[in-house]
C-alpha cells in the first residue's frame, strides 16, 4: 500500500519536468494515467537502449521517469477522444500538463472547462515562465527548456571555474527541481481539498524555481549589491569547503566548523594552522594560502588513506563516478537502484530508485514504463466509455 493509493492523476506531460513530477506521485502509490498525444511522448525514442533489445519499445530516458504509470493515446482535437478525456477527468483528482500557456484552451480543455466536469479538480501546470492565472508576465509566450531556465535563473552564472565561462549544471535541475516543487504544490492542494472540499490551480515556473534554487544569490545581492559569480567548487562564505586532488583522484572536504578545522589540521599534522587560524573569519581571509597548504597534503596521499584519516571527524568524501555508485553498498542497502523489465529485451534496465523513504508506506518504482496506449481498454472501461460502439482512436 502506498501513501497515495487513492489518488488518481491524469498526466498529460512530456519530456522531463512533468513526467518526473508525476513519477514521484506514482512511486508513492498514485494511479498515474499518462495521456499521450498521437505518437506518444517525444522522449519514447530517445536512447540509450539495452544492449540485447530485439525491438526498441522505448529507451532509458522514458523508462526512468515514466515507471509505474498507465498509458492512453488520445487526440484531443477529435470529438471522440476529447469526450473520452472528459470522462476520465470526471473521475480524476489531479490533472498535470506542461504545455505552453493556452495550449489546453485550444482543445477547450483548460482549467475552467475541466472544473465544470469536476468541481473538486486540482489542475497543475509546469511551464517555463508560469501561467497568467497566477501572475502574467511578458515571457509567457516564450518556449523554455532546462538550459534556458538555468541561464535565466542564475544557475549558470555561479557554476564553473572563476576564470571560465558560465556553465550548465550536469543534471537537468531546471526540470527536476521544478518538478519536485510542483509535486509539493499538488500534495498541498490535495491536503487543502481534504479540509475544505475546494480544488485549485497549482502553477510552477521553471524560471521561478531556479531563482528559488539560487536563494543564496538573492540575499547576497540584497546585502552587498554585488552579483555573485563563479567560484569553482568552493563556497563564498565557508572555508575549507572545496574539492581537492588526491594522488589517485579527487575528494571533497567540508571542514568549515571550528571543530572540523582542528581535526583536519591534526590529520595533516599541522597544529600550527589550527592555532593561527582558529575562527571562520581568519580562514576565509586567508583562503588561498590555506587552500594551497591543504592541496599540498592531499596530493601526496591516495584518497582511501586520506578519507580513513578523516573518517568520523571531518566531513569528506571521494568524488565518485556512476560505476562507483553502482558498487557502493550504501546505495544497495537504501534500494536506490531499481531493476525494471524492458519490453523487447531479456535484460532488465536499472533505474534510480525512490529517494523518499517512509516506514509505513515505502515508496518504490511500481514496475516498468508503459507501452504507448497499453492500457486503453481498461482505462476507457473504468471511465464508462463504450469501447465497442464508441471506439476512441487517435489520428496521427
UniProtKB/Swiss-Prot annotation:
It is an enzyme of class 2 (transferase). This is Succinyl-CoA:mesaconate CoA-transferase. GO terms for molecular function: CoA-transferase activity. Involved in the methylaspartate cycle. Catalyzes the transfer of the CoA moiety from succinyl-CoA to mesaconate to generate mesaconyl-CoA (2-methylfumaryl-CoA) and succinate. Belongs to the CoA-transferase III family. The active site is at residue 175. The keyword Transferase applies. InterPro entries: CoA-transferase_III_domain (IPR050483), CoA-Trfase_fam_III (IPR003673), CoA-Trfase_III_dom3_sf (IPR044855), CoA-Trfase_III_dom_1_sf (IPR023606), Scnl_mescCoAtase (IPR054905). Keywords: Transferase. Its EC number is 2.8.3.26. It catalyses: mesaconate + succinyl-CoA = 2-methylfumaryl-CoA + succinate. The gene is mct.
